[in-house]
Amino acid sequence: MLIVLFRSKDIRGGRFVRPILIFRTKRSWILFRIGPERRREAEMPTDLCLFSNSPDPIVPVFGTSSAKVTEWVSHQSNPFDKSGVILDIIFYIYRNIIE
């Protein structure tokens, strides 16, 4: 399990951090956004823009705060076995969501 924190700007130009949880199994990997209730438990900010990713192609879906931990990007092969794949995903998210 890995938590990636992206620094970003909100619509008012302020700064905030987007937490993304990357969880892996033997055959797949999954990206979760971290929901507000879990951020409260961890004493993290709760006023973040939230999103989930769809499997193919990786397309960000924007939403509003919700108590549910949303889903997924799931693949049959494990990208952690292939160097650089997870970094490609992180950079995709950074380029297309954060900037």
From Swiss-Prot:
Pfam (any one): Ycf15
Gene name in the database record: ycf15-A
Compartments, as annotated in UniProt: Plastid, Chloroplast
Organism encoding this protein: Zea mays (Maize)
Alphabetic keyword roster: Chloroplast, Plastid
Sequence similarity: Belongs to the ycf15 family.
Main localization category: plastid
Record-level GO cellular component terms: chloroplast
Protein known as: Putative uncharacterized protein ycf15
InterPro entries (alphabetical): Uncharacterised_Ycf15
